[in-house]
Amino acid sequence: MKIKIDSLDNIHAAAKKFLQNMGDGKVFAFYGKMGAGKTTFVKAICEELGVEDVITSPTFALVNEYTAGNGDPIYHFDFYRIKKIDEVYDMGYEDYFYGGNLCFLEWPEPIEDLLPEDCTKVTITVEEDGSRSVEF
């Protein structure tokens, strides 16, 4: 599936479309260059799920936990600064990835060997006109 985001004005419509088409998946790995909009898109998805917390990139915390409107936890990861895979083992990644709750992962490249088999890979691309394409 491919979703086009022309501007920030329609990012919530794109997030709704993503949610309508994401299936039963729980773990989503977001790929894209720096500045492609991974955090912005995850933020819009979380807002559409009823998260009222301030949603930020967990670059330094590694993981942020939010509460969806239905009370379920949502986990937002950023693996950009991972230096050693042991850091991911130490945080107990299996509890998150296999716990049955939504997990949104930015910069998953350093931990690809640990991703669940049913992880959905989402690629955000900056198009020549400045719009974004979200493919999954």
Where are these regions (language model features)?
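Phosphate-binding P-loop
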Residues: 19-25
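Short beta-strand-centered segment that lines the nucleotide-binding/catalytic pocket of NTP-utilizing
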Residues: 51-66
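N-terminal pre-Walker A segment at the start of P-loop NTPase domains
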Residues: 1-17
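Short phosphate-coordinating micro-motif centered on Lys-Gly-acidic
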Residues: 1, 47, 86-88, 94-136
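The conserved Walker
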Residues: 34
